[in-house]
Amino acid sequence: MTDRIIVKDLVVFAYHGVHPEEQRLGQRFEVDLSCAMNLREAAKRDTEGATVSYSSLVEIVAEISSRRTFFLIEALADDIARTILSRYAQIDAVTVTVRKPSAPIPATLGYVAVEVTRDRND
């Protein structure tokens, strides 16, 4: 059984996309994280130092989203996943979902999204 830390529906405003107007005007992106790790020690000790801080995960997403412009949300999701794994040895794998609710597509849709999973073997 795998334990997970989950961050759902994090909203960031950023300037990602292949179209010049996306990079100029920016738009909302929604991000979910699911970090697989052993949480037994955190549950037993009941101290913040025994786990990964949720707010630090949120900060990573905000930092990467604002640090540079990505053409593809695939690249954004991959960068978030790899950064989380590089900063937290206790996380075994991470799944990152990036949703783009306002994709410039001539159709009525809720959102487009990508989901990537990275682990220590990637």
Where are these regions (language model features)?
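N-terminal, polar/charged subdomain of small-to-medium soluble alpha/beta proteins
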Residues: 1-122
